[in-house]
Amino acid sequence: MFFIKLFTIFFLSFFWQSLKSSSQIIDFTYNGFRPPPTDISILGIATITPNGLLKLTNTTMQSTGHAFYTKPIRFKDSPNGTVSSFSTTFVFAIHSQIPIAHGMAFVIAPNPRLPFGSPLQYLGLFNVTNNGNVRNHVFAVELDTIMNIEFNDTNNNHVGIDINSLNSVKSSPAGYWDENDQFHNLTLISSKRMQVWVDFDGPTHLIDVTMAPFGEVKPRKPLVSIVRDLSSVLLQDMFVGFSSATGNIVSEIFVLGWSFGVNGEAQPLALSKLPRLPVWDLKPTRVYRFYKNWVPLISLLLIPFLLIIFLVRFIMKRRRKFAEEVEDWETEFGKNRLRFKDLYYATKGFKDKNILGSGGFGSVYKGIMPKTKKEIAVKRVSNESRQGLKEFVAEIVSIGQMSHRNLVPLVGYCRRRDELLLVYDYMPNGSLDKYLYNSPEVTLDWKQRFKVINGVASALFYLHEEWEQVVIHRDVKASNVLLDAELNGRLGDFGLAQLCDHGSDPQTTRVVGTWGYLAPDHIRTGRATTTTDVFAFGVLLLEVACGRRPIEINNQSGERVVLVDWVFRFWMEANILDAKDPNLGSEYDQKEVEMVLKLGLLCSHSDPLARPTMRQVLQYLRGDAMLPDLSPLDLRGSGIMLGTHNGSNESGMFTSGSSVAYSLLSSGR
């Protein structure tokens, strides 16, 4: 029975001591480090001098030095508990021949080795990868002597509280407050001894960092103070110590004495027992004098020189950016040539957000001319080969001299390196095609459509017969018909246009244009004439009246449906009005719609000799002439047989000369 009572008393005593151990006071004090203590581990370039100085760094460049108390310190009663109060104080000194060197830090870390700590500005604590990582679980007080912009440092002589990062949660220039609340600066790199106190109050989470010159009592007012719960930062068991680093300029950092305590204030250091620092020749050295006297002077001279170099490079780069190549033959087009610089600023650097659309030739951008505030559309035409560029520019400029109310005005051109930029007036209502297909949000009534048709017909008649030369557009289609503010139809995009004298035809044998608008004779011979424009205009008439694309895919059979053949079948069945656009509703002129559908078939006849001229087309549209009987139409319809012509691609555009959809010059694309 006696042994049972004795065992019970022993067990309860042991259990009480174990409960109490977590809140016991843990402390240690080093008034110097001689003889070298066995419970201090030193790593890297850190050493302990014969007279008992803990020397964290030496003259080795780009290295780290660590010194840690070897035993883990219990900061929390449980892994998820709150952090106990702790405090520490130490005396340090930093010596360097010039006032530029890296500093040091008091550290609480889960590992005394800090294996991933980098030198230089990282002070041996972190590196470029893990700086700021919450999994670091590192608390530190840095005494930093270099201003690093990347860490938002206060200056090049500051004290900061760091949590998992060298971006201090709070910092202050190094110094102390006297009894009269007057602040006094302290220079960290001064070869002088200074004392630092770090205190954390567990219940209030208050962190205070205080410093003072060696031998002074601890100031009443802390230098840096912040409330921060460290429960998520510190683990249950942690290691305490110091970390430092060197860069390309070295320094010597010493810790003369160190005291630390948990659940109690750190014991005061016996300042009289601390080891002495080495005796340095504090007279200005040659290196220091050079740094002090010549570096500022060189900087004053070098900064303007570097600014001049920067400005020269900036100007040269800017000139290259806006450089234009002007050849002798372009002098005659001087008034039509625009500066690339103006177009660059007009389109805000040809940014993607200003793209109105893209096509076979390139992209089209909306812009506002800087001086006149005129809205423009700029088409960037890629020109891989210089062959024929002179002739192309000459034709474009000549076309730009045309003036007709139903043509999109060409403002001018710009040639730069391997690309050509064509500048047109901007049409606010976009291209015609966006009002026709796929149940558009906004549709045109029949009066508006008939007005557009008449406008385009008038423009083509002007091109074919009224101007000083014959202009074959070669790319008449709905997307190249632009609508101005009054919804007048304007024919644009003369990128494929060709000029010839009246009474003659162009000699080209190159098939260009957009699939679905190409006349069979043009595909067969490669020759473009005014009748090929009439064919494309006939397809356009059917598009406007039917609200369908020139070529569509049947959703059920997957076959291609040619609009001209589709309308022709309705005509053969004597119900051609059934081909009209359902979006027209019931408010339309039946005779006009029927006339436009039949005129579209006539214009898109497979035989070019059976097609009317644009003069005749205008007469039919204006009611000045009666539309001829369509009964002689060849039952083969349009003559376009999809899949029988080589050279087309899946997108329906001829690879030999695809056009840029001019609707891209509008806001609707």
UniProtKB/Swiss-Prot annotation:
What is the superkingdom listed in this entry's lineage?
Answer: Eukaryota
Hey, what's the signal peptide range on this chain? 1-23
Q: Where is this region: Legume-lectin like?
A: 26-260
Identify a single GO molecular function assigned to this protein: protein serine kinase activity
Pfam families given in the database record: Lectin_legB, Pkinase
The Protein kinase domain sits at 350-627
Glycan attachment residues as annotated in the record: N58, N80, N127, N152, N185
Any one GO cellular component localisation term in the record: plasma membrane
On the Extracellular side, which residues?
24-294
The residue stretches assigned to a coiled coil in this entry are none
| Gene3D superfamilies per UniProt | 2.60.120.200, Phosphorylase Kinase, domain 1 (3.30.200.20), Transferase(Phosphotransferase) domain 1 (1.10.510.10)
Identify the residue ranges that face the Cytoplasmic compartment according to the record. Answer: 316-669
Q: Which family does it belong to?
A: In the C-terminal section; belongs to the protein kinase superfamily. Ser/Thr protein kinase family.
Known role: Involved in resistance response to the pathogenic oomycetes Phytophthora infestans and Phytophthora capsici and to the pathogenic bacteria Pseudomonas syringae.
Q: What is this protein called?
A: L-type lectin-domain containing receptor kinase IV.4
* Organism listed in the record: Arabidopsis thaliana (Mouse-ear cress)
